[in-house]
UniProtKB/Swiss-Prot annotation:
Function: Catalyzes the GTP-dependent ribosomal translocation step during translation elongation. During this step, the ribosome changes from the pre-translocational (PRE) to the post-translocational (POST) state as the newly formed A-site-bound peptidyl-tRNA and P-site-bound deacylated tRNA move to the P and E sites, respectively. Catalyzes the coordinated movement of the two tRNA molecules, the mRNA and conformational changes in the ribosome.
Protein name: Elongation factor G
UniProt xrefs under NCBIfam families: EF-G, PRK12740.1-5, small_GTP
Any GO CC annotation of this UniProt entry: cytoplasm
The organism of origin for this protein: Neisseria meningitidis serogroup B (strain ATCC BAA-335 / MC58)
Length: 701
């Protein structure tokens, strides 16, 4: 089957924004104009095509990035038909792992800002992620029809808060209720969209008299930005010659792809104005898969760097970037194909796990509908059905040419909550549901607490876990109760001791006898956690019983004597003991070792350890004092401060996890929502006496 759309006409783009900047409405309009949806879905009534999970429709926030395919050949049908793969990304801080994952597979992004709210904290986080993956981007200032809308203020905020280099290529005609269209600075004409057909057609008109001067000034800025693309253009510009429209677009494209400028447009998605011109800008200024550098990776056999060109002729390579459960077909694995071609029925290699996978059916998504396709070619995005063991971030490739594409880094979860099924019937379903959800979302973990037998779920924040519990209920019909957030404490010893225990029972018939002497000492914190050394001389304990001593101690480690938390960082030497020819058994030595360990721990000055988090807060300078004071109150140690590169400060600190619950809410209110933070586990360290006492009390409570 030959390629239908040349790879140069592909645009893989993300629509990214802060909550409530109107991103979903913008995506919805894109789908409408590109001919996919005939009735416009409004987020206001929960009908948007890309918000296809029920909770998103309810909460009005976009949680999962849906990949949608559509086509565009220009407002005036001036381009050959281009194929867009649009990835909708979430804007809430608990879902940054989703945003990061989408950024990895995009070639370009459209950043949507609210004309009233401007650059918001989440916009800064997303901007940093786009910088990390070097994604070329456009900015679209939405909601120009709202009270307080101001396009030029957002241009300034992009410079000061994001340290961006925005270059408007349109400016608004009017604002608030009077917003009627835009001035196209390339053509120096106003564009007025037809309200009757929801903006599908438009007319060019003269620039309103009161805007001519402003338009001239912004056109000059745009031409200067274009001229900086090459010496040749700069000479032409400085020599007083006019640059042609083609030269300007070509130069702006070159600088956008290099990340030197960010072209800016504006409109009101809700009022069907401006999105159409932005789609033309995507064609003109954002990259095709062939415009970006070859994807880098590592050959798993040689561990040497390798790469793949975006070409059908190359060997197949793709990245699995999203898992979704679909109630009709089961697991959907979204893949971005970087090179080569894959057909349904092909067998490919999962190079991360070293396993083979058969590609079942391949489908292309239009928000929540799907079309079966026979093959996917370089530069395209599709979903595969029937993959057995593929997790987000893994590479699929040709068996004859293995490669592991850059791994995505996922943060460690920081919050644990116990979940209990409400009924016996829910118990089995819950296990299946949680395992499926963990496969979809690498920042979410599930484990069983050995002491209580409870199921513990861990994630990136309280909202993250709320949504997981919600999805269990909706998608799998599991009703569950959830506990309060918990901290994972540990225990250890502070001094070396010697302990002895003799387990001897004689009650008629075969007795039990095991006798051990152990030396216990603290190990380097954060090391292996436990080490067992056999120092028995002269067979005082026979060889076959030595592993039982080790096992007896290992089985006791999960329940320490301070507050019943797992014991870490202890070294045990088995130095002496005795046995009985008839009465000694493996069980007797396990019991003796377990008791000797408990005895030793009591003498060894036991301590409670608490998890310490590395916390980074990015805040505007004026809130710096409040942020530092608050971290100190939380028993935090501030390690340093840096400029964050976008006009604010970055504070680095180490803070006990126990003090960080509810932090995002407190930080939001202390900084009017302008600071953001990230935290990850750093180390365990000894908890102060009063904290240890309180924890112990609560456990025994």
């Amino acid at each position: 089957m030959a390629r239908k759309t040349p790879i140069s006409l592909y645009r893989n783009i993300g629509i990214s924004a802060h909550i409530d900047a109107g991103k979903t409405t913008t995506t919805e309009r894109i789908l409408f104009y590109t001919g996919l949806t005939h009735k416009l879905g409004e987020v206001h009534d929960g009908a948007a095509t890309t918000d296809y999970m029920e909770q998103e429709q309810e909460r009005g926030i976009t949680i999962t990035s849906a990949a949608v395919t559509s086509y565009w050949s220009g407002m005036a049908k001036q381009f050959p038909e281009h194929r867009f793969n649009i990835i909708d990304t979430p804007g809430h801080v608990d879902f940054t792992v989703e945003v990061e994952r989408s950024m990895r597979v995009l070639d370009g992004a459209v950043m949507v800002y609210c004309a009233v709210g401007g650059v918001q904290p989440q916009s800064e986080t997303v901007w940093r992620q786009a910088n990390k993956y070097q994604v070329p981007r456009l900015a679209f200032v939405n909601k120009m029809d709202r009270q307080g809308a101001n396009f030029f203020r957002v241009v300034e905020q992009m410079k000061t808060r994001l340290r961006a280099n925005p270059v408007p290529i349109v400016i608004p005609v009017g604002a608030e209720d009077n917003f009627s269209g835009v001035v196209d600075l390339l053509k120096m004409k106003s564009i007025i969209w037809n309200e009757v057909d929801k903006g599908t057609t438009f007319t060019y008109g003269d620039i309103p008299a009161e805007l001519v001067e402003t338009a001239e000034e912004w056109r000059q800025n745009m031409i200067e930005a274009a001229a900086e693309a090459s010496e040749e253009l700069m000479d032409k510009y400085l020599g007083g010659d006019e640059l042609t429209e083609e030269e300007i677009v070509g130069a702006l494209r070159q600088r956008t792809l290099a990340g030197e400028i960010q072209p800016m447009l504006c409109g009101s998605a809700f009022k069907n104005k401006g999105v159409q011109r932005m789609l033309d800008a995507v064609v003109e200024l954002l990259p095709a898969p062939t415009d970006i550098p070859p994807v880098q990776g590592v050959n798993p056999n040689t561990e040497e760097a390798d790469s793949r060109q975006a070409s059908d002729e190359e060997k197949f390579s793709a990245l699995a970037f999203k898992m979704l459960n679909d109630k009709y077909v089961g697991q959907l694995t979204f893949i971005r194909v970087y090179s080569g071609v894959v057909k349904s029925g092909d067998t490919v290699l999962n190079s991360v796990k070293g396993t083979r996978e058969r590609i079942g059916r391949l489908v292309q998504m239009t928000a929540a509908d799907r079309t079966e396709i026979e093959e996917v070619r370089a530069g395209d995005i599709a979903a595969a059905i029937g993959l057995k063991d593929v997790t987000t971030g893994e590479t699929l490739c040709a068996e004859s040419a293995p490669i592991i594409l850059e791994r995505m880094e996922f943060p460690e979860p920081v919050i644990h909550i116990a979940v209990e099924p409400k009924t016996k019937a829910d118990q089995e379903k819950m296990g299946i549901a949680l395992n499926r959800l963990a496969k979809e979302d690498p920042s979410f973990r599930v484990r069983t607490d050995e002491e209580s037998g409870q199921t513990i779920i861990s994630g990136m924040g309280e909202l993250h876990l709320e949504i997981i519990v919600d999805r269990m209920k909706r998608e799998f019909g599991v009703e569950a109760n959830i506990g309060a957030p918990q901290v994972a404490y540990r225990e250890t010893i502070r001094k070396a001791v010697k302990a002895e225990y003799k387990h001897a029972k004689q009650s008629g018939g075969k007795g039990q006898y095991g006798h051990v002497v152990i030396e216990m000492e603290p190990m380097e914190p954060g090391g292996e956690g436990y080490e067992f050394i056999d120092e028995i001389k002269g067979g005082v304990i026979p060889r076959e019983f030595i592993p039982s001593v080790d096992k007896g101690i290992r089985d006791t480690l999960p329940n320490g004597i301070v507050a019943g938390y797992p014991v870490v960082d202890v070294r045990i030497r088995l130095v002496f003991g005795s046995y009985h020819d008839v009465d000694s058994s493996q069980l007797a030595f396990e019991l003796a070792a377990s008791q000797a360990f408990k005895e030793g721990m009591r003498q060894a000055s036991p301590a409670l350890l608490e998890p310490i988090m590395a916390v980074e807060v990015e805040t505007p300078e004026e809130y710096m004092g409040d942020v530092m004071g608050d971290l100190n109150r939380r028993r935090g140690v501030v390690l340093g401060m840096d400029d964050d590169g976008i006009g604010g400060k970055k504070v680095r600190a180490e803070v006990p996890l126990a003090e960080m619950f509810g932090y995002s809410t407190d930080l939001r209110s202390a900084t009017q929502g302008r600071a953001t933070y990230s935290m990850e586990f750093k180390k365990y360290s000894e908890a102060p006496a009063h904290i240890a006492a309180a924890v112990t009390e609560a456990r025994k409570g």
